[in-house]
Amino acid sequence: VHTTEVIEMGDHPAKAFQQKTNSSIVVGFGYLAKGLINGFASAGSTGAMMVGSMQAVKPIEGVIRPTISTVAPTVTGGKVLLLDVGLNVDCKPEVLAQYGIIGSIYAQAMLGIRNPRVAVLNIGEEETKGNAQSKAAYELMKESEEFNFVGNVEGSHLFSGQVADVIVCDGFVGNTCLLYTSDAA
């Protein structure tokens, strides 16, 4: 679709989404909201994409924050889902726990994994490791009956395929992992 405006990477996401109504991101979300398309992706402003996902398309009831995820191959030939990879650089523990639910549902529906193993990316496998955010997320996730929580994983387990099928982290850590591995590939 041809548009005459662009939401630049340096634009304030919410203001740009409201003001640049003939940008591809706003037009795309408009089509999505009207049911003219089934999905929408953009290589443009991540912030504007988040604004669009929260304003133009009604989020699933109960979802606190949307996420960006990526599916990566594992050394065992399987797949691993990593989320968040850049949308929310700071996440409350409740959001990380919710990503466990979202990731588990996605892994079942889209990757065909029957009982996906969900883990928190952390600096150690032990329950007591990590910052306050990771420890609090761990506590919430281990109590959840909505997914198969297997604990913490370290970066060395990201692509092993042996520990987890879904790995949850904040967008700062996830984006760092994503960019590091894409550069290494």
Positions of the model-derived regions?
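Phosphate/nucleotide-donor binding subsite
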Residues: V1-I37
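Short, glycine-/small-residue-rich phosphate/pyrophosphate-handling segment
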Residues: P73-I105
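Oxyanion-binding "anion nests"
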Residues: Y138-L178
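Short Gly/Thr/Asp-enriched flexible loops that form oxyanion-binding sites at enzyme active sites
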Residues: S42-I64, Q133, L179
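Conserved small/polar residues in nucleotide/adenosyl-binding loops
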Residues: Y180-A185
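Short, acidic/small-residue loops that bind anionic groups at enzyme active sites
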Residues: G52-D84, S144-V153
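Glycine-rich phosphate/diphosphate-binding loop of Rossmann-like nucleotide-binding domains
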Residues: P93-G155
